[in-house]
Amino acid sequence: MISRTIRILGIDPGLRRTGWGVIDVEGNRLIFVACGTVESRESLPLSERLLAIHEGLVRVVSEHRPLEAAVEQTFVNKDGAGTLKLGQARGVAMLVPAMSGISVAEYAPNLVKKTVVGAGHADKNQIQVMLKILLPKAAPPTPDAADALAIAITHAHHRQSAMLLRKVAAL
């Protein structure tokens, strides 16, 4: 049986830095494609910062042509204004792939950590160690790019689990 290659874009939304990571999935094999960070200057008005994120992610989608995307969910914290701004960046991160007809999944940060490291409260160093094992050719330039790759890996794992469950249910 020939397995189809699925290209997945993982996005770690942030107003200062939005990480992105692209992987290919062939069966149960993960292949690193690219990763990086879209940055916006704090000195700019919010609308221009959101536009910078939008334009950067449009370039990523256009260049790498993912078939599926995944975005990290955010939680409300003590800084309500900061949470709202992060939510706006997250909205842009979900909108860009959706505008290209790409389905967008969402994953909680603890689920990403549990999927990649095996512990829901893993730290960034543990994530980077596992990324080196799972994607040896990846060298994320920022922690945000590393997180985005972890989000893409989480989506790859959960989509395969869902496919297996559908096959078992059909028996």
UniProtKB/Swiss-Prot annotation:
Binding, Mg(2+) 1: D12, D144
Cofactor(s) annotated in UniProt: Mg(2+)
Catalytic residues (UniProt): D12, E72, D144
Keyword flag Nuclease: yes
Cellular component terms (Gene Ontology): cytoplasm; Holliday junction resolvase complex
Assembly description: Homodimer which binds Holliday junction (HJ) DNA. The HJ becomes 2-fold symmetrical on binding to RuvC with unstacked arms; it has a different conformation from HJ DNA in complex with RuvA. In the full resolvosome a probable DNA-RuvA(4)-RuvB(12)-RuvC(2) complex forms which resolves the HJ.
Family per similarity comment: Belongs to the RuvC family.
Full protein name: Crossover junction endodeoxyribonuclease RuvC
Native source species: Afipia carboxidovorans (strain ATCC 49405 / DSM 1227 / KCTC 32145 / OM5) (Oligotropha carboxidovorans)
